[in-house]
Amino acid sequence: MGAISTATLSGVLLLDKGSGMTSNSALQRARKLLDMRKAGHTGSLDPLASGILPLCFNEATKLSSYLLDSDKRYRVLARLGVTTDTGDADGEVRLRTPVPALDEPALLTVLAGFTGPILQVPPMFSALKHRGKRLYELARKGVEVERPPRPVTVFEIELAGRGADYLELDVHCSKGTYQAVEKVSIEAAMYPFAWVRGRRKPFFSAPTAAWAPPLGAARPFWAH
């Protein structure tokens, strides 16, 4: 029996996307690597973010709309005492300020206050569109437009770690929740300035990163 072409296979690949790559770029590279006819992902991760990006191939692309509505989990690392124009590590530093000593009981109280249904204003540096233009394209030109708040739900925020100038949080949230906005809002309640140093999506509902190959290992993983 001859080898089965991957182009005829259907399924979902949990790709461990690296930082610095757009979700669409990861999708197209995986589609080409696996020689798939149809491919789609289940919701973009920011280029800065790393972690699990479910990729649907061929007949499995019909599942993507259901996965888009699933809850998300993120590990968020935030640098304190620095603010950037984008709210994350990709932006230009606008201001630096001393970081006061962390008060963990007060911090936990603040975190609890940011759970539940909330209205969140999307950041300018996002892929949302305004009159046909991506917001990040306008932001790079120095243009800021009004963004209506959108309802999202933060189910849980846990303090995973902390240091003199950073916080590490595990966030369980609904789709469409912007971690940079959530982080800035939380830290503004305790500290003057902060930015998101990095974000990792460690799992998507049940799956964990242990099941997800990086892009370079996608083909042997899929074939296995």
Swiss-Prot record:
Signal peptide: none
Catalytic residues (UniProt): D46 (nucleophile)
Recorded GO MF terms: RNA binding; tRNA pseudouridine(55) synthase activity
Keyword field: Isomerase, tRNA processing
Presence of keyword Cell membrane: no
Protein transport as UniProt keyword: no
Catalysis: reaction(s): uridine(55) in tRNA = pseudouridine(55) in tRNA
InterPro entries in the cross-refs: PsdUridine_synth_cat_dom_sf (IPR020103), PsdUridine_synth_N (IPR002501), tRNA_psdUridine_synth_TruB (IPR014780)
Protein origin, superkingdom: Bacteria
GO biological process: mRNA pseudouridine synthesis; tRNA pseudouridine synthesis
Record-listed E.C. numbers: 5.4.99.25
UniProt record similarity statement: Belongs to the pseudouridine synthase TruB family. Type 1 subfamily.
NCBIfam families in UniProt: TruB (TIGR00431)
Functional description taken from the UniProt entry: Responsible for synthesis of pseudouridine from uracil-55 in the psi GC loop of transfer RNAs.
Record-given protein name: tRNA pseudouridine synthase B
Gene: truB
